[in-house]
Amino acid sequence: PAIVANPQDREARSEALYGAWLCGVCLGSVGMALHHKLCHVIGGAFDLPHADTHTVILPYAMAYNAKAAPHADAAIARTLGGRDGTSALIELAGRLGSPRSLKSLGMPESGIDRAADLAVQNPYWNPRPIERT
């Protein structure tokens, strides 16, 4: 991304700010799904950093929902220039040096079952059904 290549690029920074604003508008206009639910459950229960938790969880939630939301996945793939939205987002995170695992954020492996239990306690809208298996 241009802002990574040149952090002083005012146009790139302006476009990033506008994109962030659009994301906020979307959050106020749509139902939250699996990604947001998992981030709040995991971040809150294990005291993980908010933005980094979103960065790690998003590709996995997208992969889970891709079959139920193929148009959204295709739009993300087109925007990021990948074969599918999930892999394109993972590649972008890698190029940016973003965290790639919950372990790197401090989540213990022993917390996975607890996180799964918490995530299914209060049903959330999601394009694909969520079940604890």
How would you name each of these model-derived features?
Residues 1-88:
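Active-site segments that bind and position negatively charged phosphate/pyrophosphate groups
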Residues 79-133:
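C-terminal charged capping/lid subdomain of soluble metabolic enzymes
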